[in-house]
């Protein structure tokens, strides 16, 4: 959903678009709630309130002020992520249809021959960091840039077994045109940048679990963040390999040597960050022209000093000359060194060339050892070739993708590695490593152990659901880690599957009730965005690849109506009720019927069941940004911070009724997951609320009416407005509450319209218009620990006779209250009041 705020209506009609005019009779929160539950994708919001827009954005729903027609046309035709703090729109708009172009934000790609392999008539477009270079295309009242790129397809090609790039990219573009937009991938880059900048400024120690290559630029400016990954491939691990020969295989039609060099340097850099938590000087020997340095500098102020007879245009200090072992003394401490020396083969025969390569490998290794032999805070990455070698057993092996697999690989060493035990590694073993291993991640830090960290903020995005983690340990970490943002895969199967397959792995599945957290927000991706100053135009869809975002230790926990709130809670219900159901009131009717309340007259305005809880349960796959458990808990402890809106606090029994209705719904749908979720939420309600039932009552509240439009033979027909189980000493407390509610009780619009047999020989008249006040009264008694109401649903009625009678129907007739009283069952009236 996207909300585009206009000061006046537009003449043009757009598909999947609805107009909402601000309702001055309602406050900003109520307007925001009504907007959020509209069913179209585009909402044109007229006569808007800025406060309402703020409320929607905090809820993760993109809402933007529009000043020009161009702005409206641009935003209505594509999806986007909105930074509502800095007023920046990040479009996710592929431009195939306007410019026949493939988009990239990696500068090195533009310096390859990739255009030779694009579709006929197509070109490559460089858009800069998150589309920064496209800002000039949009002369808007807000900052706007198009962050959509095809880098995901380019990188997937590099790691795939496909060689024909044109066929590969054509297939990927067709996939993009026939499947839903990978909005999370596009939006996630914006989110990660914002997230870690915020966390580093707010927390002294941040830990990140499971980063992948898509985050390799995000952390360049955050050396203090401790990374945990899958660990490195060490020299000593080659002991498991059998010897092989040179294979030789082309991985890419266009030259990706620069990409390999970038990955090597970034892997080395993150090793340095892991050890020293600060930025080093980056020395590079060879590897010109290194256009990728431009990409790195978009994200960080890292300094590069380079040596190569060829130009390196983006280096801070370039020496256009060869580098020798004697030059190592020029290199300072607190640095990394990348050695990529290899002369061109030119016309040399194979044997001569092989001899040169082995000599250069020995020379490269000598430079590395010399660099690491003195000083402090140093890490080196050196180019190697498959040959008989003695190498430190703790050194890390790298084999990032390159244009052709031949005989080269890379070795990362720190000072300690260079002095560690060395082992002889035969050439054939190194060929086996090269032929069968592609390094897939620049993050090669040690794996994360599933244990609580006392002083750190833990971030684990899409990293802990894998079934090689112990599920109980994951739950324990979420429950006990005081400061964290952790995601786990949500269980949106229908058979309550404990794990689901994803790509070539299996993930555990989770529901919010799997966790026991009292100070954590459990929400969706879009709900999480709102807490970090972002909103999105396309909400999460129940694809099977959805995650719960669990934020622990956030200062937004008590702000119940501002973040992870009830916005859009009825949206899925509206979509179904107005397009597929037998009646638009089907939800209300089902909730009443499933709790044995058969008086459906006015059910849409007088309902016994919490619609919020019911919708949050049965449609949780469509909207789990609403943190239901937090909502229940904060109300149960009376700690909810409510900023505005027509906010109705439910009585705990209404929540129980909702769970029962959801359970009935789940059985009809054969939805085992909702069935379990409903049971567990009901158990949670009973846990946090101390609900007691007056199933053996000794007092009741009665309402006597001035007029009863039916024949009756009981002595005093009345409405039993709830029963109590109290001691005589509590009577004054009950009376005090009744007096407090006096005006509201006498203002009730009480009506009746038919009679019916409640059971055999109990003839009653229906009563409407009292449920809302009944549940408010229930809440007041609950807060004073007064037992009021029974476990079965309260069905308001007036007993007319204790014999079987014929059902009577009349027009809706108002019942005027004569007086209200408190009486002991089989005893005397102890209190009464009149208007």
Swiss-Prot record:
Highest classification ranks of the organism: Viruses, Riboviria, Orthornavirae, Duplornaviricota, Resentoviricetes
Protein name as annotated: Protein VP3
Self-association state and partner proteins as the record states: Interacts with VP1. Interacts with VP2.
Catalytic activity: a 5'-end diphospho-ribonucleoside in mRNA + GTP + H(+) = a 5'-end (5'-triphosphoguanosine)-ribonucleoside in mRNA + diphosphate; a 5'-end (5'-triphosphoguanosine)-ribonucleoside in mRNA + S-adenosyl-L-methionine = a 5'-end (N(7)-methyl 5'-triphosphoguanosine)-ribonucleoside in mRNA + S-adenosyl-L-homocysteine; 5'-triphosphoadenylyl-(2'->5')-adenylyl-(2'->5')-adenosine + 2 H2O = 2 AMP + ATP + 2 H(+)
EC number: 3.1.4.-, 2.7.7.50, 2.1.1.56
Coarse class of the protein's main subcellular location: virion
Keywords: GTP-binding, Host-virus interaction, Hydrolase, Inhibition of host innate immune response by virus, Methyltransferase, mRNA capping, mRNA processing, Multifunctional enzyme, Nucleotide-binding, Nucleotidyltransferase, RNA-binding, S-adenosyl-L-methionine, Transferase, Viral immunoevasion, Virion
Domain notes: Contains a bipartite N7-methyltransferase domain, a 2'-O-methyltransferase domain and a GTase/RTPase domain. The C-terminus contains a phosphodiesterase domain that degrades the 5'-triphosphorylated, 2'-5' linked adenylate oligomers produced by the host cell in response to IFN stimulation.
Biological process annotations from GO: symbiont-mediated suppression of host innate immune response; viral process
General function of this protein: Multifunctional enzyme involved in mRNA capping. Catalyzes the formation of the 5' cap structure on the viral plus-strand transcripts. Specifically binds to GTP and displays guanylyltransferase and methyltransferase activities. Has affinity for ssRNA but not for dsRNA. Capping activity is non-specific and caps RNAs that initiate with either a G or an A residue. Together with VP1 polymerase, forms a VP1-VP3 complex positioned near the channels situated at each of the five-fold vertices of the core. Counteracts the host innate immune response thanks to its phosphodiesterase that degrades the 5'-triphosphorylated, 2'-5' linked adenylate oligomers produced by the host cell IFN-inducible 2',5'-oligoadenylate synthetase (OAS). The host RNaseL is therefore not activated.
CDD domains according to UniProt: capping_2-OMTase_Rotavirus
Keyword S-adenosyl-L-methionine attributed: yes
Protein family: Belongs to the rotavirus VP3 family.
Naturally occurring in which organism (per UniProt): Rotavirus A (strain RVA/Cow/France/RF/1975/G6P6[1]) (RV-A)
């Amino acid at each position: 959903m996207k909300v585009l705020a206009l000061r006046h209506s537009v003449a043009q009609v757009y598909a999947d678009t609805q107009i909402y005019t601000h309702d001055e009779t309602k406050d900003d929160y109520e307007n925001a709630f009504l907007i959020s539950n509209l069913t179209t994708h585009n909402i044109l919001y007229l006569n808007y309130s800025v406060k309402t827009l703020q409320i929607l954005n905090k809820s993760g729903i993109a809402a933007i002020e529009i000043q020009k027609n161009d702005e409206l046309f641009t935003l209505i035709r594509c999806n986007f992520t909105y930074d509502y703090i800095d007023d920046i729109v990040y479009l996710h708009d592929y431009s195939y249809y306007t410019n026949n172009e493939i988009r990239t934000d990696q500068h090195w790609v533009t310096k390859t021959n990739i255009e030779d392999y694009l579709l006929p008539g197509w070109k490559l477009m460089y858009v800069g960091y998150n589309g920064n270079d496209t800002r000039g295309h949009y002369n808007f009242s807000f900052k706007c840039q198009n962050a959509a790129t095809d880098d995901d397809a380019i990188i997937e090609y590099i790691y795939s077994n496909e060689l024909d790039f044109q066929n590969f990219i054509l297939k990927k573009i067709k996939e993009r045109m026939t499947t839903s937009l990978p909005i999370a991938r596009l939006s996630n880059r914006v989110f990660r940048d914002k997230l870690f900048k915020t966390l580093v400024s707010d927390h002294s120690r941040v830990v990140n679990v499971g980063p992948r290559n898509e985050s390799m630029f995000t952390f360049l400016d955050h050396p203090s963040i401790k990374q945990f990954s899958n660990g490195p491939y060490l020299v000593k691990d080659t002991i498991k390999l059998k010897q092989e020969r040179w294979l030789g295989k082309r991985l890419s039609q266009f030259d990706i040597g620069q990409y390999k060099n970038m990955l090597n340097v970034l892997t080395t850099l993150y090793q340095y960050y892991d050890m020293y938590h600060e930025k080093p000087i980056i020395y590079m020997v060879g590897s010109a022209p290194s256009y990728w340095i431009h990409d790195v500098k978009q994200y960080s102020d890292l300094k590069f000093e380079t040596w190569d007879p060829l130009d390196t245009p983006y280096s801070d200090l370039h020496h256009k000359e060869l580098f020798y072992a004697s030059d190592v003394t020029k290199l300072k401490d607190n640095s990394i060194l990348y050695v990529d020396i290899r002369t061109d083969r030119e016309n040399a025969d194979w044997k001569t060339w092989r001899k040169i390569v082995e000599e250069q490998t020995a020379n490269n290794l000598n430079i590395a050892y010399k660099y690491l032999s003195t000083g402090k805070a140093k890490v080196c990455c050196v180019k190697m070739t498959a040959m008989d070698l003695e190498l430190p057993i703790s050194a890390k092996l790298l084999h990032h993708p390159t244009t052709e697999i031949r005989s080269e690989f890379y070795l990362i060493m720190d000072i300690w590695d260079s002095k560690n035990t060395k082992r002889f590694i035969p050439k054939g073993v190194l060929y086996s490593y090269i032929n069968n291993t592609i390094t897939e991640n620049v993050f090669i830090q040690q794996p994360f152990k599933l244990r609580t960290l006392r002083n750190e903020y833990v971030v684990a995005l899409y990293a802990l659901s894998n079934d090689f983690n112990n599920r109980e340990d994951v739950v324990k970490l979420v429950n006990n880690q005081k400061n964290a943002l952790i995601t786990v895969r949500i269980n949106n199967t229908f058979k309550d599957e404990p794990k689901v397959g994803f790509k070539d792995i299996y993930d555990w599945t989770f529901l919010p009730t799997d966790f026991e957290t009292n100070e954590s927000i459990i929400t969706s991706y879009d709900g999480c965005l709102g807490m970090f100053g972002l909103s999105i135009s396309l909400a999460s869809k129940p694809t099977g690849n959805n995650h719960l975002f669990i934020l622990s230790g956030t200062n937004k926990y008590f702000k119940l109506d501002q973040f992870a709130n009830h916005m859009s809670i009825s949206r899925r219900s509206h979509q179904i009720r107005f397009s597929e159901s037998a009646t638009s009131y089907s939800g209300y009717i089902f909730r009443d019927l499933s709790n044995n309340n058969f008086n459906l007259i006015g059910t849409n305005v007088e309902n016994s069941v919490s619609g919020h809880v019911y919708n949050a349960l049965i449609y949780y796959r469509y909207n789990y940004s609403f943190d239901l458990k937090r909502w229940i808990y904060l109300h149960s402890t009376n700690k909810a911070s409510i900023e505005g809106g027509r906010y109705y606090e439910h009585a705990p029994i209404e929540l129980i009724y909702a769970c029962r209705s959801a359970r009935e719904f789940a059985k009809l749908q054969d939805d085992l997951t909702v069935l379990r979720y409903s049971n567990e939420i009901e158990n949670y309600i009973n846990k946090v609320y101390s609900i007691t039932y007056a199933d053996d009552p000794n007092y009741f509240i009665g309402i006597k009416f001035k007029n009863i439009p039916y024949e009756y033979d009981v002595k005093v027909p009345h409405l039993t407005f709830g029963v109590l189980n109290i001691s005589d000493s509590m009577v004054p407390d009950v009376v005090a509450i009744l007096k407090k509610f006096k005006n509201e009780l006498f203002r009730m619009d009480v009506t009746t319209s038919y009679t019916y047999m409640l059971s055999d020989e109990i003839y009653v008249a229906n009563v409407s218009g009292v449920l809302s006040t009944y549940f408010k009264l229930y809440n007041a008694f609950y807060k004073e620990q007064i037992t009021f109401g029974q476990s079965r649903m309260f069905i308001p009625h007036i007993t007319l006779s204790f014999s079987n009678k014929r059902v009577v129907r009349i027009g809706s007739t108002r019942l005027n209250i004569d007086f209200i009283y408190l009486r002991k069952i089989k005893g005397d009236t102890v209190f009464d009041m009149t208007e």
